[in-house]
Amino acid sequence: MITSTSNQQIKKLSLLMKKAKERKEQDLFVVEGVKMFGEAPREWLAGVYVSEQFVSNEEHRKLLSDVPYEIVADSVFRAVSDTQTPQGILAVVRMPKYTMDDMLRGDQTHLLILESVQDPGNLGTMVRTGEGAGITGVVMNR
């Protein structure tokens, strides 16, 4: 069990949570909460951290049955968590990388192609709308 915020794994986790540059350099991101953990493909998981309280629940242990995880002291988990009331589970996830060939493969390819979107709010709206319309990928310039 991890009992200190000085633990190397916790330091790395904190850095990933706080620094976009670090996430980009390592091709990793962090998800928090039961729903987000459940939606993350298992093969993309690079690490799972759970609080003592979380793992003491039988249903939660079933959720973790197919993945290795680290138990973190409740106080340490609260310190590293990004939310006001943590659910008790954080996962480090590998960012998938797709080539254009990957996106064009398949019978039902529907791409949203964007150029020079300046407002992040507009980008989010377009992606959510596209998802509702059944897009299978997004292509955009920097």
Mark where each language-model region is.
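Glycine/small-residue-rich loop that forms an oxyanion/phosphate-binding "nest" at active or ligand-binding sites
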Residues: 58, 64-97
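Short, glycine- and charge-enriched coil/turn segments that flank and shape catalytic ligand pockets
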Residues: 54-68, 100-109
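A short, local hydrophobic-aromatic micro-motif
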Residues: 46-47, 70, 136
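A short, well-structured juxtamembrane/interface segment
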Residues: 34, 97-102
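RNA substrate-binding interface of SAM-dependent RNA methyltransferases
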Residues: 42, 103-142
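Boundary-proximal intrinsically disordered activation/regulatory segments immediately upstream
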Residues: 1-59
